[in-house]
């Protein structure tokens, strides 16, 4: 039986720095990238493009199973490509976000997307960014990281990010939203946000991104070496 491509899962709460870390890892290692958080938005956009009814689970399942999506890494950003078109900005619209929330409620759609996500596991390897990558999607991943940071630090990062883009934002409101989202994510019935038992927990609160990257790469080298030796 041929050996499967290695997977590194990066899970954690919103604002912990997963996206930046995954982009750097994919660039450094030359591995494929899966942004699971974008998958439902991409499916929603595909449904809108193809006039598929958002309340028809039966119509959405085959669309999910055959979703033509790629995540392309370059030095500036991760491009989300649907059917050959860069949709990185389009999937962030409110219309697509609302549609994504609606279709995510269908169990058979979730199951189809689970299989689609697992199909990203190709040589030379996969960096999987999400919230349940190491616990649900790739429980057999060779390297599992849970990237965390205090709610205050994550709110501060988001505050600076939005300010730099010219938005007028309230820090206390951001902090409240992050705490509420954490509570929802950690206590939901299906795939709650939690570190896999065999994950390395990295608290990035007082670390630079370079320090986080170095820590993860050193751990990955150790784990992948152990996996190839066993």
Curated annotation (Swiss-Prot):
The protein's Enzyme Commission number: 2.7.4.25
Main location: cytoplasm
GO cellular component: cytosol
An annotated GO BP: nucleobase-containing small molecule interconversion
Record localization: Cytoplasm
Alphabetized Gene3D superfamilies for the sequence: P-loop containing nucleotide triphosphate hydrolases
Residue sites binding ATP per the record: 12-20
SUPFAM superfamilies in the record: P-loop containing nucleoside triphosphate hydrolases
Catalytic reaction list: CMP + ATP = CDP + ADP; dCMP + ATP = dCDP + ADP
One Pfam family of this chain: Cytidylate_kin
Keyword Kinase: yes
Keywords for the protein's UniProt record, in alphabetical order: ATP-binding, Cytoplasm, Kinase, Nucleotide-binding, Transferase
Superkingdom in the source lineage: Bacteria
Molecular function GO terms recorded: ATP binding; CMP kinase activity; dCMP kinase activity
Protein family (similarity comment): Belongs to the cytidylate kinase family. Type 1 subfamily.
Identification of the protein by name: Cytidylate kinase
Lineage: Bacteria, Pseudomonadati, Pseudomonadota, Gammaproteobacteria, Aeromonadales
